[in-house]
From Swiss-Prot:
Residue intervals passing through the bilayer: 50-70, 84-104, 140-160, 194-214, 272-292, 300-320, 373-393
Family: Belongs to the insect chemoreceptor superfamily. Heteromeric odorant receptor channel (TC 1.A.69) family. Or2a subfamily.
Chief subcellular location: membrane
Keywords of this entry: Cell membrane, Membrane, Olfaction, Receptor, Sensory transduction, Transducer, Transmembrane, Transmembrane helix
Cytoplasmic topological intervals: 1-49, 105-139, 215-271, 321-372
GO annotations of cellular component type: dendrite membrane; membrane; plasma membrane
Pfam short name (any one): 7tm_6
Subunit structure: Interacts with Orco. Complexes exist early in the endomembrane system in olfactory sensory neurons (OSNs), coupling these complexes to the conserved ciliary trafficking pathway.
Localization: Cell membrane
GO BP annotations listed: detection of chemical stimulus involved in sensory perception of smell; sensory perception of smell; signal transduction
Keyword Ribonucleoprotein among record annotations: no
Protein name: Odorant receptor 43b
Length: 403
């Protein structure tokens, strides 16, 4: 992974860079998690894959309910809520990880569509934009990594400060409540085991926005090519064959983008649906904990956790919203591209292409609702609803009495 840090900065034109390089970090993380993306796993990596899959999809999600059953009476309210929000997130993480395992081949298929789109980027300005896109998305992934690592570390420090474990997962034969030694042992065990899952989560949470953001760059490049079709400075505007070939290239690029959406949509659909549902519940629990129970030091970790939760949905919703607007601009650009001065064949092709462009590229969650900023706002409203219900039930007083 560290060999790819050069991708943080835009590469010069002389250096070969592809759109698929924008997800190099994310792919390397998935490979380290056990996904055999290159079909080159030996015995050692296959054994690691069994351990990784078992821990991420079985042991970690189950460890929270087991701990609740055994030690529920010993949970203070703020620790119970803090553990519950992480429990919900790990269930969603297990679902996303399983989905990526099932649809691993679609990630490579999407990258092959990126390779096709790169073939249409022949001008130096287009190549520079691709390099800028790779650097921007690489930084976006690093933002996920920094926020997630900051959350893991701050939770560990807060736990040590309050003489408790950071995540409250279940470990047989270890009871951190007995003495300090067992508390330190479980704290650092959790930091490395749950921390590994958090490391994998940087990929499972970021892959939708990484692919969609790269797609948007190619949509904007296509818009520039369509605008250039009707540009008076276009030297080939008087050559019908050249103009028709340029138009056909735009159509092929658009078709490749639609194929890309078909490839990536099944992966995004189910995972983001679960993410929206879980995210609203998690944010509601966070609000209850922060307002009613958490102290100042714990609130810092909660704020970092809120940032991590928002990263799971907001950037993707933003880019999906932007793509819908960009698709409308594609149709407007083609309509104003002086197509009426070309020959009949060109005009007929433009009309058919225009009909296709009027259908925006949209991503949906289980074909129930569109992924956009309006949906993200509704998730936030649901979080306020959860908090309002808890406040109306005087949850703080009831939990304090039980404590």
């Amino acid at each position: 992974m560290f060999g790819h840090f050069k991708l943080v900065y835009p590469a010069p034109i002389s250096e070969p860079i592809q759109s698929r390089d924008s997800n190099a970090y994310m792919m390397e993380t998935l490979r380290n998690s056990g996904l055999n993306l290159k079909n080159d796993f030996g015995i050692g990596r296959k054994i690691w894959r069994v351990f990784s899959f078992t821990y991420n999809m079985v042991i970690l999600p189950v460890s929270f309910p087991i701990n609740y059953v055994i030690h529920l009476a010993e949970f203070p309210p703020e620790l119970l809520l803090q553990s519950l929000q992480l429990c919900l997130n790990t269930w969603c993480f297990a679902l996303k990880f399983f989905t990526l395992i099932v649809y691993t081949h679609r990630l490579e298929l999407a990258n092959k569509h990126f390779d096709e789109l790169d073939k249409y980027c022949v001008k130096p300005a287009e190549k520079r934009k691709v390099r800028d896109m790779v650097a921007t998305i690489t930084r976006l992934y690093l933002t996920f990594v920094v926020v997630y690592v900051l959350y893991a570390t701050s939770t560990l420090l807060d736990g040590l400060l309050h003489h408790r474990v950071p995540y409250n997962t279940y470990y047989p034969f270890i009871n951190w409540r007995v003495d300090r030694t067992q508390m330190y042992i479980q704290s650092f065990l959790e930091y490395f085991t749950v921390g590994y899952a958090i490391y994998v989560a940087t990929a499972t949470d970021s892959y939708p926005v990484i692919y969609v953001a790269a797609l948007r760059t190619h949509i904007l490049l296509l818009k520039d090519r369509i605008i250039y079709l009707g540009d008076p400075s276009n030297e080939g505007s008087s050559d019908p064959s050249y103009m028709f070939k340029s138009l056909v290239d735009c159509i092929k690029a658009h078709r490749t983008m639609l194929n890309f959406c078909d490839a990536i949509q099944p992966i995004i659909s189910g995972t983001i649906f679960a993410q929206f549902i879980i995210c609203g519940s998690i944010l509601g629990i966070i609000m209850i904990n922060m307002v009613l129970f958490a102290d100042q030091s714990t609130r810092f970790g909660i704020v970092i956790y809120v940032m991590a939760v928002l990263l799971q949905t907001f950037p993707l919703c933003f880019y999906c919203n932007a793509i819908v607007d960009d698709c409308k601009e594609l149709a407007h650009a083609l309509f104003h591209s002086a197509w009426w001065v070309q020959d009949k064949r060109y005009q007929r092709t433009v009309i058919q292409f225009l009909q296709k462009l009027q259908q925006p590229m949209t991503f949906t969650a289980m074909n129930i609702f569109n992924i956009n900023l309006a949906t993200n706002i509704n998730v936030a409203k649901f979080a306020f609803t959860v908090y309002a219900i808890a406040s109306g039930m005087n949850l703080d007083q009831k939990l304090s009495i039980k404590e």
